[in-house]
Amino acid sequence: MSEVKIGKNESLDSALRRFKRQLQRAGVLAEIRKREHYEKPSVKRKKKSEAARRRKYR
């Protein structure tokens, strides 16, 4: 888990922004969204195939 230590003259808002930025860089939020609902293996394969097809034709 990410940790943010607040400096002497740092506001809570700026520390919260740093924390959110760290989570986003670590990919935690994307992982949470991905695991929010169970996805059958067949659906995962289909999504992966469609993503590859989109990448190929762009």
Curated annotation (Swiss-Prot):
For bias kind Basic residues, which ranges apply? 43-58
Q: Which Pfam families match?
A: Ribosomal_S21 (PF01165)
Q: Name one GO cellular component term.
A: ribonucleoprotein complex
Alphabetized UniProt keyword annotations = Ribonucleoprotein, Ribosomal protein
Q: Which domain of life is it from?
A: Bacteria
Q: What GO molecular-function term can you cite, just one?
A: structural constituent of ribosome
Q: Which InterPro entries match?
A: Ribosomal_bS21, Ribosomal_bS21_CS, Ribosomal_bS21_sf
Q: Where is this region: Disordered?
A: 36-58
Q: Does the keyword Ribonucleoprotein apply?
A: yes
- Transmembrane helix among the record's keywords? no
Q: Name one GO biological process term.
A: translation
Q: Which family does it belong to?
A: Belongs to the bacterial ribosomal protein bS21 family.
Please identify the protein, giving its name as recorded: Small ribosomal subunit protein bS21
Q: Give the source species.
A: Symbiobacterium thermophilum (strain DSM 24528 / JCM 14929 / IAM 14863 / T)
